UniProtKB/Swiss-Prot annotation:
Catalyzes the conversion of UDP-4-keto-arabinose (UDP-Ara4O) to UDP-4-amino-4-deoxy-L-arabinose (UDP-L-Ara4N). The modified arabinose is attached to lipid A and is required for resistance to polymyxin and cationic antimicrobial peptides. NCBIfam families: PRK11658.1. Keywords: Aminotransferase, Antibiotic resistance, Lipid A biosynthesis, Lipid biosynthesis, Lipid metabolism, Lipopolysaccharide biosynthesis, Pyridoxal phosphate, Transferase. GO terms for cellular component: membrane. It comes from Klebsiella pneumoniae subsp. pneumoniae (strain ATCC 700721 / MGH 78578). Its EC number is 2.6.1.87. GO terms for biological process: lipid A biosynthetic process; lipopolysaccharide biosynthetic process; response to antibiotic. The modification N6-(pyridoxal phosphate)lysine is found at K182. Pathway: Nucleotide-sugar biosynthesis; UDP-4-deoxy-4-formamido-beta-L-arabinose biosynthesis; UDP-4-deoxy-4-formamido-beta-L-arabinose from UDP-alpha-D-glucuronate: step 2/3; Bacterial outer membrane biogenesis; lipopolysaccharide biosynthesis. Belongs to the DegT/DnrJ/EryC1 family. ArnB subfamily. This is UDP-4-amino-4-deoxy-L-arabinose--oxoglutarate aminotransferase. Pfam families: DegT_DnrJ_EryC1.
């Protein structure tokens, strides 16, 4: 068997190693100047006013919800077709996740579904920019504004994603992820952008013990007077070791996403006559970042189940992923919310499969995946 082809692999090279050496030699390896540079770079990338680097997008979601005052008795609208950390954070704050269905073909929430789920207890809406495509954020934001409800964009998949000519996160509040499989990575990390000055200040405090300044600020400006806790907070700051990696990855993002697009376009062309159906791309003006390439494997049409297909591809040395198993079908949420029924989410959650997609894939790697799928489809 050929070498195993994973569904994702981070693209790291000499520039990342040099950036790490620079930080290690500097004597300041935790939150410091590289964080500040990363935050400034994301303000430039998105056009938003504030950027706050954090240790993960999950931590970013936690402190953003908390900074908005989300707590017991509140409801937060979210798709079930998302990574479970969002729902976990809502529940850990004592609020209730209100899971809504997604469009059957692009797997993102719609303004109509959001509108139908709003109650007097709704305090936030969390649309997900999915697989590298943008949600119809103008329409969703309009619903939030009409009801006075905050919108938090889950942009974990959206580094390099554009909506109507602007980078996702150019206004409002959005949360990006730098996890190992993302379009740009620093192993673990995340970043929040916002145009709300007060919210940015609260998030900065909450992500570092509830203090008004971080360790680098105190080192730079002196320790007198001693920083005080403004409100109890967490330790979600990003180390400069990670921020240095993220800065190099950001420089490579455009080129990396171009390669992702080339691979995705080959999949679209060369699998078009197979029964493996990809997600549809949004009808609104956008630039896709192709974080994931997802097919739907319907046993009735394909002659094989999704799980069986993944096993056969694994036996052929090809890795795949599942993004995501719907949250409401998992034990805790299934038992807590037994009444939730989301037909589009459930149909897709049982059939979606993420194919290998990362910038360092060779043309031969792509051919190998396509050939395997054509073989398994009988084409």
């Amino acid at each position: 068997m050929s070498d195993f082809l994973p569904f994702s692999r981070p693209s790291m090279g000499d520039a990342e190693l040099a950036a790490l050496r620079e930080v290690l030699a500097s004597g300041w390896i935790t939150t410091g100047p590289k964080n500040q540079a990363l935050e400034a770079a994301f303000c430039q990338l998105t056009g938003n006013r504030h950027a706050i680097a954090v240790s993960s997008a999950t931590g970013g979601m936690h402190v953003t919800l908390m900074a908005l005052g989300i707590g017991p008795g509140d409801e937060v609208i979210t798709p079930s077709q998302t990574w479970v950390s969002t729902l976990n954070m809502i529940c850990l704050l004592g609020a209730t996740p209100v899971m809504i269905d997604v469009d059957n073909d692009n797997l993102m929430i719609t303004p109509d579904a959001v509108e139908a789920a709003i109650t007097s207890r709704t305090k936030a809406i969390i649309p997900v920019h999915y697989a590298g495509a943008p949600a119809d954020i103008d329409a969703i934001r309009a619903v939030g504004e009409r009801h006075g409800i905050s919108v938090i964009e889950d942009a974990a998949h959206a580094a390099g994603t554009h909506y109507k000519g602007r980078h996702v996160g150019w206004q409002g509040t959005a949360i990006f992820s730098f996890h190992a499989i993302k379009n740009m990575t620093c192993a673990e990390g995340g970043l929040i952008v916002t145009d709300d000055d007060e919210l940015a200040s609260r998030i900065r405090s909450l992500k570092f013990h509830g203090l008004g300044v971080d360790a680098y600020d105190r080192q730079t400006h002196g320790r007198a007077p001693q920083a005080e806790v403004i409100t109890p907070g967490f330790k979600y700051n990003l180390a400069d070791i990670n921020a240095a990696l993220a800065l190099v990855q950001l420089e490579k993002l455009s080129h990396a996403n171009q390669r992702r697009t080339e691979i995705a376009q080959r999949y679209l062309r060369e699998l078009a006559d197979t029964p493996f159906k990809p997600l549809s791309v949004p009808t609104w003006d956008h630039q896709h970042a192709w974080h994931l390439f997802i097919i739907r494997v319907d046993e009735a049409a394909c002659g094989i189940s999704r799980d069986a297909l993944m096993e056969k591809l694994k036996a052929m040395g090809i890795g795949t992923g599942l993004h995501f198993r719907a949250a409401h079908t998992q034990k805790y949420y299934r038992e807590r919310f037994p009444e939730v029924s989301l037909p589009n989410t459930e149909w897709n959650s049982a059939r979606i499969c993420s194919l290998p997609l990362f910038p360092d894939m060779t043309d031969d790697d792509v051919t190998r995946v396509i050939s395997a799928l054509r073989q398994l489809s009988g084409r």
